[in-house]
């Protein structure tokens, strides 16, 4: 994976965006070789689509999945559901986070154009 001003984790407020000039130059040198974009979390959709058009075939968004999981789990606990019945059971406690990750992945698959592809 090449560095095109992408980072792992959350992007700072003053992030200027991806360097498409660099990505284009890399694509010219690598030809049809699929490229990977690390640090895909938080990159605007238009930039993601442009990166795909320039040869990016895999985009890592683990931080976004982790943030979705944490937010859903936090909401469950803040609502006091862990104190109701057997809501403390890890299978129940973690279920909202798991569902949130699934929703995030489905959303990203749509954006990346990978739905229906093996």
Predicted segments, located by residue:
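Glycine-rich phosphate-binding active-site loops on the catalytic face of alpha/beta enzymes
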Residues: 4-9, 54-70
């Amino acid at each position: 994976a090449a560095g095109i001003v992408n980072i792992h984790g959350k992007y700072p407020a003053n992030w200027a965006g991806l360097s498409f000039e660099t990505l284009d130059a890399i694509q010219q040198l690598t030809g049809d070789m699929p490229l990977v974009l690390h640090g895909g979390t938080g990159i605007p959709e238009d930039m993601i689509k442009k990166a795909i058009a320039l040869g990016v075939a895999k985009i890592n968004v683990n931080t976004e999945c982790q943030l979705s999981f944490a937010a859903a789990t936090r909401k469950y606990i803040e609502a006091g559901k862990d104190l109701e019945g057997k809501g403390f059971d890890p299978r129940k406690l973690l279920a909202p986070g798991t569902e949130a990750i699934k929703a995030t992945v489905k959303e990203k698959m749509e954006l990346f154009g990978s739905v229906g592809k093996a």
